[in-house]
Swiss-Prot record:
Keywords: Disulfide bond, Neurotoxin, Postsynaptic neurotoxin, Secreted, Signal, Toxin. SUPFAM superfamilies: omega toxin-like. Pfam families: Toxin_20. Postsynaptic neurotoxin. Disulfide bonds join 52-66, 56-77, 71-82. GO terms for cellular component: extracellular region; host cell postsynaptic membrane. Residues 23-48 form a propeptide. Its main location: secreted. The lineage of its organism: Eukaryota, Metazoa, Ecdysozoa, Arthropoda, Chelicerata. This is U4-theraphotoxin-Hhn1k. It comes from the Eukaryota.
């Protein structure tokens, strides 16, 4: 009885992990297939640079210390600009 229960729980755990991994791979493959043209990627890069520097400029005008805006998705704020990590 215990062996059967352990086997069922193990299979369920493996199934959940496999399903999660498969969904991640499918999402990555869709991103790779669809992709964005270089011009759109450049626009996204410019937006990230703009967002980070404008955030710091606004905070400086209020006589407050400039707090770096958190950049997401593999980007970080450095010298008031989002840079790819």
């Amino acid at each position: 009885m215990k062996v059967t229960l352990i086997a069922i729980l193990t299979c369920a755990a493996v199934l959940v992990l496999h399903t999660t991994a498969a969904e991640e791979l499918e999402a990555e493959s869709q991103l790779m297939e669809v992709g964005m043209p270089d011009t759109e990627l450049a626009a996204v890069d410019e937006e990230r640079l703009f967002e980070c520097s404008v955030s710091c400029e606004i905070e400086k005008e209020g006589n407050k210390d400039c707090k770096k805006k958190k950049c997401r998705g593999g980007w970080k704020c450095k010298f008031n600009m989002c840079v790819k990590v």
